[in-house]
Amino acid sequence: TKDEGTFIAEGGGVR
């Protein structure tokens, strides 16, 4: 998921 915070949980996305 490309969201701030979820990049760690989802394994990708915007920091």
From Swiss-Prot:
Cellular location(s): Secreted
Keywords: Adaptive immunity, Blood coagulation, Coiled coil, Disulfide bond, Hemostasis, Immunity, Innate immunity, Secreted
Subunit structure: Heterohexamer; disulfide linked. Contains 2 sets of 3 non-identical chains (alpha, beta and gamma). The 2 heterotrimers are in head to head conformation with the N-termini in a small central domain.
Post-translational modification: Conversion of fibrinogen to fibrin is triggered by thrombin, which cleaves fibrinopeptides A and B from alpha and beta chains, and thus exposes the N-terminal polymerization sites responsible for the formation of the soft clot. The soft clot is converted into the hard clot by factor XIIIA which catalyzes the epsilon-(gamma-glutamyl)lysine cross-linking between gamma chains (stronger) and between alpha chains (weaker) of different monomers. Forms F13A-mediated cross-links between a glutamine and the epsilon-amino group of a lysine residue, forming fibronectin-fibrinogen heteropolymers.
Main location: secreted
Protein name as annotated: Fibrinogen alpha chain
UniProt record, GO biological process: adaptive immune response; blood coagulation; innate immune response
Function: Cleaved by the protease thrombin to yield monomers which, together with fibrinogen beta (FGB) and fibrinogen gamma (FGG), polymerize to form an insoluble fibrin matrix. Fibrin has a major function in hemostasis as one of the primary components of blood clots. In addition, functions during the early stages of wound repair to stabilize the lesion and guide cell migration during re-epithelialization. Was originally thought to be essential for platelet aggregation, based on in vitro studies using anticoagulated blood.
Cellular component GO terms held in the UniProt record: extracellular region
Recorded domain comment: A long coiled coil structure formed by 3 polypeptide chains connects the central nodule to the C-terminal domains (distal nodules). The long C-terminal ends of the alpha chains fold back, contributing a fourth strand to the coiled coil structure.
Coiled coil: none
